[in-house]
Amino acid sequence: MEVQLGLGRVYPRPPSKTYRGAFQNLFQSVREVIQNPGPRHPEAVSAAPPGAHLQQQQQQQQQQETSPRQQQQQQQGDDGSPQAQSRGPTGYLALDEEQQPSQQRSASKGHPESACVPEPGVTSATGKGLQQQQPAPPDENDSAAPSTLSLLGPTFPGLSSCSTDLKDILSEAGTMQLLQQQRQQQQQQQQQQQQQQQQQQQEVVSEGSSSGRAREAAGASTSSKDSYLGGSSTISDSAKELCKAVSVSMGLGVEALEHLSPGEQLRGDCMYAPLLGGPPAVRPCAPLAECKGSLLDDGPGKGTEETAEYSPFKAGYAKGLDGDSLGCSSSSEAGGSGTLEMPSTLSLYKSGALDEAAAYQSRDYYNFPLSLGGPPPHPPPPHPHTRIKLENPLDYGSAWAAAAAQCRYGDLASLHGAGAAGPSSGSPSATTSSSWHTLFTAEEGQLYGPCGGSGGGSAGDGGSVAPYGYTRPPQGLAGQEGDFPPPDVWYPGGVVSRVPFPSPSCVKSEMGSWMESYSGPYGDMRLETARDHVLPIDYYFPPQKTCLICGDEASGCHYGALTCGSCKVFFKRAAEGKQKYLCASRNDCTIDKFRRKNCPSCRLRKCYEAGMTLGARKLKKLGNLKLQEEGEASNVTSPTEEPTQKLTVSHIEGYECQPIFLNVLEAIEPGVVCAGHDNNQPDSFAALLSSLNELGERQLVHVVKWAKALPGFRNLHVDDQMAVIQYSWMGLMVFAMGWRSFTNVNSRMLYFAPDLVFNEYRMHKSRMYSQCVRMRHLSQEFGWLQITPQEFLCMKALLLFSIIPVDGLKNQKFFDELRMNYIKELDRIIACKRKNPTSCSRRFYQLTKLLDSVQPIARELHQFTFDLLIKSHMVSVDFPEMMAEIISVQVPKILSGKVKPIYFHTQ
């Protein structure tokens, strides 16, 4: 039986009194139908004696004086009444199959006087499963009905004192006056009994016996009208309390769910769950077709109508259910159709055992492995409510079935194993088959890979691996074929509110079949191996070659230097011509891409400094002619394959004469640095020495950059790198200054910088004439020995690794290897120009002697600068900060002998 309430939706909300009176009429009708399901006899109403009203009031007062403990004992004693026994061993009350005339139902709903007085001695015509019996006479202290419906709060005063002839009074005119008098009398009674009723109501609510009292009201004998409508508390306007009272009277008490969180109430795992630990009383099943009206349908009127929406579930649900998830067994005795047998412990409310901490240990509320099969630590008493409506939580109709076939949520098989039935279970099935509902067909396949274990397994197989990170219950695992569960399954926990997602181990990492056939524009190349097929970054962005003269993009090596086309043409015209260029400034004009045409004199000087000579062009032409002559001669004296081979060898030998090492040295060679000296001022000791110190610091910055760009230098230890630069900076500057003096002024003067050139006068003025003479002699050695630019570059790099501490460096072994490599490079450069080994050794001896001659000059300059630093405040010579630090810290180590140069020859 179902009661659908639609208050506040179609019609406006009635007044509170009328609202409460309407519910009282409704519940009185329900109560009378439950107690006396037979036809109504209006004659009993009129046959009531005139003094029945006073007798009922006396019974009501006596009933209120009884303690709640006596009422509870009386209620427990009612279970042995014939009315309670009439429910049968399984506790089913098939109210939806009562055969009642429509006229009697309409009379019970339409006439309010039928709800005032119960009819004793009425036989009931029961349906299936109910016996025709005579209800027991009412006890004097029977409070089943008032205690059950007392939660409704205050009763409607207009009906609380109605007499037996209320039907005649209401049909006459002017009946409202009588109702007002009755209302006043009722209010006086309420004031006297208010305190007792409030205490009784609190005890009833605290004991949580609302659902039990509603059941006893359905099976207890009828009581008097005043006992049913007797004392109550004040009228409450709160709709929440009214809804709570309605739910309690209908057996859907909300008090049992108030302690749950909103998420647990929405999840619904406390609904339709078999009571843990309850006695597994089972009755023989009726065929499924006979149970449609009472078990699987929504109400008594829907038992004969099988809609298309629920037809798949009703037709195949019993076949998909096996075992104790429902306490139902499949039997072929009842005509071969699927049958259900229901235990009496199937509860509508959440079991009290679920509140125990031990009951939640095996429950995962994120993956929903609703392990409800095991017995609880403390089995609760059997729950009285056994007649519930069975629903399939995954049966959402044909529309959902069509959409579910397209889902790809992965293999959700075998996530729950329901427990076996109790020891007294009469179910022939000892195991259950409970798994997640599949959302795809076997033909379509699945997007995710295997989840670590198949759905197969027998009952009691505890070795199955759960795909979602938790272990299955060891009992109740039914064998399944393949990885797909049966299409229809039963969830003991009720409606599942969210779909469990597979763990990361379940996600398929390989490409699917639809991707394997597509190789893409780059063939069968995988992303993880794509780096093996990518060319170096230099292939896409080659290092840009710049002109050594103006800094523009170089077009190649012209006249012995890497220059652009403009500087190539300029040098050819200027070197072959007879014009003399003079600088309008101080011979320190800036030559770049935009100002290279401003000063031809400085541009030509820079070309010579870069090593450009007309002889390099002539040597190149002679080399090409020689190769051509050798090729023509080989064509006459040898087969056709030999000329190509000889030409290739000749080209390789030519490339060896210009190794890559030299190209690097040419590219990293520092440019010309100006001292910033004012040549318009008269020369003085302080001015000249201050300009030299300023030039030394500027050149030191370029030396650091140049050293870091040398091949292999960065492989040294950081401390070794700093030490080598700080010890060799003076020798490097002297050697570079001698080369500039040789190339620019033919060693007649000391070419420190374009704006600082020392002649004889300045040499004397600087008070370092002896040191200047030795430096000029070094510059003349470049001319006497005819040092080439390639030899100069290699010798300069080797000079960097020619002075070390006596105690050695931190990585002395690697320093020695690096120094030896540069010596070999110098010997290779010498060998490229000379074919005679004797001349090569002589040349090597000359160059190494020249390198050894730099060290004594550098030592004299170290001593001079250190003495000058000490007397700088007296002679007004400025020392930049970095120069002062190096001279004050590192130079004393050299002068004291802690740091010594490495000589090629014995001194």
Swiss-Prot record:
Annotated spans, Interaction with LPXN: 539-906
Region (Interaction with KAT7): 612-906
Zinc finger motifs (NR C4-type), residue ranges: 547-567, 583-607
Main location: nucleus
Biased composition (Polar residues): 123-134
Functional note: Steroid hormone receptors are ligand-activated transcription factors that regulate eukaryotic gene expression and affect cellular proliferation and differentiation in target tissues. Transcription factor activity is modulated by bound coactivator and corepressor proteins like ZBTB7A that recruits NCOR1 and NCOR2 to the androgen response elements/ARE on target genes, negatively regulating androgen receptor signaling and androgen-induced cell proliferation. Transcription activation is also down-regulated by NR0B2. Activated, but not phosphorylated, by HIPK3 and ZIPK/DAPK3.
Full protein name: Androgen receptor
Record organism: Canis lupus familiaris (Dog)
Gene name linked to the record: AR
